[in-house]
Amino acid sequence: MAASLGFRGAASGLRYWSGRRRPVGSLAAVCSRSMASKTPVGFIGLGNMGNPMAKNLIKHGYPLILYDVFPDVCKEFKEAGEQVASSPADVAEKADRIITMLPSSMNSIEVYSGANGILKKVKKGSLLIDSSTIDPSVSKELAKEVEKMGAVFMDAPVSGGVGAARSGNLTFMVGGVENEFAAAQELLGCMGSNVLYCGAVGSGQSAKICNNMLLAISMIGTAEAMNLGIRSGLDPKLLAKILNMSSGRCWSSDTYNPVPGVMDGVPSSNNYQGGFGTTLMAKDLGLAQDSATSTKTPILLGSVAHQIYRMMCSKGYSKKDFSSVFQYLREEETF
């Protein structure tokens, strides 16, 4: 989520590519696999994010070989002429470039290492890109297993949400072998306007976890500020306008406001349906908590945000967008 948070430009030390700039580095040095431009690409995971991401690859001329644990979501792709595989292993047998977009660490482990996983049929030299948001340690373990099979694994989680996935303006944070970055960039640039090389495998996940922790904190802060203003008699649209002209401005206030009726086209104005689920935010904050524990880093606000989103999940908000924290604050008498 939130490509606007922390990724307005290239950070120091990061390899960076924007859809508005020329790619970094020469494609001439990339292996023949990545230069096979319009050969089929495998895509596994066609949920809220994966579906529009896959469609953007198709728009750029890439034929796809698709798989999802729920066959019904593949129907529209099959009707459009794309291939649908019977398992992740089947995808790996037919494609040497595969992108996965899955909900959790456990899902990624199953898709890669399970009984019918990618590693059962992966070809030497294949490029495997995981855009799921998972524990960095899981990415590192998967990379080791993939390397044993003679293939390449890169983690490339995304930020920007469903809207950016649809428009092809995602931010990708990429971790892996640097000389494979251009090969990954060829595909990721079809789905995102910002593709950043962050370092070794797991670095992309670490960057994404930091971003989502900040996003959760800023969303809670925006919801609290808006709620306070409304209870003080301020018009919510006026308050949002003031915030967005002032130092409190952030992505949660100017692009994804949590108050119903303040903005069109956002989950808060659609009963908090669609978008980025509260369950997923709680999961990502759990990853941040684990990372903080392993690195002995204090995350005081991150820990509180984790507690809030866990409480929301236990009180019926699990399937609503994470901006529903505003509704939660309004309904909780204890706050």
UniProtKB/Swiss-Prot annotation:
Predominant location: mitochondrion
Coiled coil: none
Keywords on record: Acetylation, Branched-chain amino acid catabolism, Mitochondrion, NAD, Oxidoreductase, Transit peptide
Modified residue annotations for N6-acetyllysine: K59, K75, K120, K144, K148, K237, K241, K320
Reaction catalyzed: 3-hydroxy-2-methylpropanoate + NAD(+) = 2-methyl-3-oxopropanoate + NADH + H(+)
InterPro entries reported for this sequence: 3-OH-isobutyrate_DH-rel_CS (IPR002204), 6-PGluconate_DH-like_C_sf (IPR008927), 6PGD_dom2 (IPR013328), 6PGDH_NADP-bd (IPR006115), HIBADH (IPR011548), HIBADH-like_NADP-bd (IPR029154), HIBADH-related (IPR015815), NAD(P)-bd_dom_sf (IPR036291)
One GO BP: valine catabolic process
Pfam families in the record: NAD_binding_11, NAD_binding_2
Tissue/organ expression: Higher level in kidney, liver, and heart than in muscle.
Effect upon mutating N212Q: Decrease in activity
Location(s) in or outside the cell: Mitochondrion
Targeting signal (transit peptide) range: 1-35
Modification type N6-succinyllysine: residues: K59, K75, K94, K140, K148, K237, K241, K296, K320
Superkingdom of source: Eukaryota
Positions annotated to bind NAD(+): 39-68, 102-103, 107, 133, 283
Active site feature: K208
Keyword NAD: yes
A molecular function (GO) term: NAD binding
Involved pathway(s): Amino-acid degradation; L-valine degradation
Protein family according to the UniProt entry: Belongs to the HIBADH-related family. 3-hydroxyisobutyrate dehydrogenase subfamily.
Subunit and interaction comment: Homodimer.
Protein name in the entry: 3-hydroxyisobutyrate dehydrogenase, mitochondrial
Species this chain originates from: Rattus norvegicus (Rat)
Lineage, uppermost ranks: Eukaryota, Metazoa, Chordata, Craniata, Vertebrata
Gene designation per UniProt: Hibadh
